[in-house]
């Protein structure tokens, strides 16, 4: 794998991280990904909710959490209340139900701001990856490992990958904004 391909993979990882970040933003539609950031103390160890319970979405605005160990119900409930999701869990002794309430216009605007901030972080990360790649190619040129033509080709490849990745960020952001604003 060449230098450009290696850095292109890093750009794709930045895009994946952006999508994971978008998944944690609450919209009016229930998804299991909404709870990805929630951890529960399980034997004094912070453990991902998905590792201690089954999370299902039977309806568009309902999430059901069924822990494998019923003694975790209170801990899961506490973890959800402490999260930034603004959700009120309902514990019936067997499962926890999360009803996703409609978003207020103010909350929608806040979520759009958060989505834009995540997108900007991704763009900055992608540009930094491009800069690192170009610097590595220039070092290779100085050391005689790359010819002048190979250096130019590498710089063009980095720029092309950066442009494509930044366009993907813009597309993902537009989709997420539409999802947030239209519910």
Curated annotation (Swiss-Prot):
Location relative to the cell: Cytoplasm
Alphabetical list of SUPFAM superfamilies matching this protein: Ribosome recycling factor, RRF
TM regions (residue ranges): none
Keywords for the protein's UniProt record, in alphabetical order: Cytoplasm, Protein biosynthesis
Coiled coil: none
Any Gene Ontology CC annotation: cytoplasm
Function: Responsible for the release of ribosomes from messenger RNA at the termination of protein biosynthesis. May increase the efficiency of translation by recycling ribosomes from one round of translation to another.
Protein name from the UniProt record: Ribosome-recycling factor
Organism listed in the record: Treponema pallidum (strain Nichols)
Lineage, top ranks: Bacteria, Pseudomonadati, Spirochaetota, Spirochaetia, Spirochaetales
Gene name of the encoded protein: frr
């Amino acid at each position: 794998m060449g230098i450009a391909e290696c850095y292109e993979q890093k750009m794709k990882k930045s895009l994946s991280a952006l999508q994971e970040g978008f998944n944690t933003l609450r919209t009016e539609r229930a998804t299991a990904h909404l709870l990805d950031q929630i951890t529960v103390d399980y034997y004094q160890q912070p453990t991902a909710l998905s590792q201690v319970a089954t999370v299902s979405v039977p309806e568009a605005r309902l999430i059901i959490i069924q822990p494998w160990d019923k003694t975790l119900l209170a801990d899961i409930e506490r973890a959800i209340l402490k999260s930034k999701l603004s959700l009120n869990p309902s514990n019936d002794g067997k499962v926890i139900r999360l009803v996703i309430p409609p978003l207020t216009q103010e909350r929608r605007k806040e979520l759009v701001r958060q989505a834009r901030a995540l997108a900007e972080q991704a763009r900055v990360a992608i540009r930094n990856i491009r800069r690192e790649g170009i610097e590595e190619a220039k070092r290779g040129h100085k050391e005689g490992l790359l010819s002048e033509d190979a250096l130019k080709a590498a710089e063009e490849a980095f720029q092309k990958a950066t442009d494509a990745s930044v366009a993907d960020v813009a597309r993902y952001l537009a989709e997420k904004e539409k999802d947030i604003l239209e519910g």
